[in-house]
C-alpha cells in the first residue's frame, strides 16, 4: 500500500497491510440504484443545485440511469450502503482491490491510461462499466476515472509514517486536523497559507474522476474532502465483510 516513487508525500512509504476477507461492489453506484433508496425514503433526494454543475454542462449531463451517482456527500454515501446492509470501503481495502498484490500503478497494470481504460480528462461521466479494458486484478471496473469514491477512513496525512501496528491507522479527528493545519502553515502537500483551517474531519476518496488527468488516476493517489461536501466528481461503491 502507498508508493515510494512517483507519489505524493502522504503516500509514503509503501508498506504491507494484512486484511480480513471482504467484498467490494464491481461497479460504482448508479443513479438508478440510488433513486431506489430515495424512493424508499431512506436516502436524500439529489439536489441539482451545485456550484460545479454548470462548469461541466449542467445537471442533465450526469443523470442518465446508468451513470454513477455524483454530487453525493460522505454521509449520504454511508447511508446508501447501510441501506443495502453494506458499508463504505476502508482505504486499504479499496487499494487492494485496485492494485492486487503486485503494487501496480493503475488497476490494469503500469501502462499509462487511455480512453479504452478510463473515463478521464473530459467533461462528464460515462455509464458504469463502459471501460472493461481498465478492469482491476479482481475484475472491478471504473477504479480509475469516472468519479472519486468516498471511503470510510478519516484522512490522515501522516498515517503511513507510523510504525508497527499503528501504521496506516488514522489518528483522532483532533489529531488529524492539527496535522493538516501544520501542513497548511508550512505549505506542504498542496496546502498553502490561504487554505482554510479544517473545521471538520476530512474523509478519503480514491480512484480519480472524469475531469482529472492521467497521473491523477494512480491507485495510490489519496484525495480528501470534508464529509459534508457534495462534489460533482464524488460518488461511491459499497463493500461488506467477507
Model-derived features: where do they sit?
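Non-catalytic surface loops within mature trypsin-like serine protease
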Residues: 3, 21, 30, 110, ...
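Short, structured beta-strand segments at or near domain termini in extracellular proteins/domains
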Residues: 231-242
Amino acid at each position: 500500500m502507498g508508493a515510494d516513487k512517483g507519489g505524493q508525500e502522504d503516500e509514503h512509504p509503501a508498506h504491507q497491510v494484512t486484511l480480513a476477507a471482504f467484498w467490494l461492489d464491481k461497479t460504482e453506484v448508479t443513479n438508478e440504484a440510488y433513486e431506489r433508496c430515495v424512493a424508499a425514503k431512506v436516502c436524500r433526494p439529489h439536489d441539482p443545485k451545485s456550484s460545479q454543475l454548470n462548469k461541466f454542462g449542467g445537471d442533465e449531463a450526469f443523470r442518465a440511469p446508468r451513470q454513477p451517482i455524483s454530487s453525493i456527500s460522505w454521509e449520504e454515501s454511508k447511508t446508501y450502503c447501510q441501506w443495502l446492509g453494506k458499508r463504505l470501503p476502508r482505504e486499504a481495502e479499496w487499494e487492494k482491490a485496485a492494485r492486487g498484490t503486485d503494487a501496480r500503478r493503475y488497476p490494469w497494470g503500469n501502462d499509462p491510461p487511455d480512453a479504452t481504460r478510463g473515463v478521464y480528462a473530459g467533461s462528464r461521466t460515462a455509464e458504469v462499466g463502459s471501460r472493461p479494458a481498465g478492469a482491476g486484478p479482481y475484475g472491478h471496473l471504473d477504479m480509475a476515472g469516472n468519479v472519486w469514491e468516498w471511503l470510510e477512513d478519516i484522512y490522515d496525512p501522516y498515517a503511513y509514517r507510523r510504525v508497527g501496528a499503528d501504521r496506516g491507522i488514522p489518528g483522532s479527528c483532533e489529531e488529524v486536523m492539527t496535522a493538516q493545519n501544520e501542513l497548511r502553515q508550512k505549505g506542504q502537500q498542496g496546502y498553502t497559507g490561504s487554505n482554510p483551517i479544517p473545521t471538520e474531519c476530512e474523509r478519503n476518496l480514491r480512484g480519480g474522476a472524469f475531469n482529472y488527468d492521467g497521473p491523477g488516476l494512480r491507485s495510490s493517489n489519496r484525495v480528501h474532502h470534508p464529509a459534508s461536501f457534495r462534489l460533482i466528481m464524488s460518488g461511491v461503491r459499497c463493500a461488506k465483510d467477507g
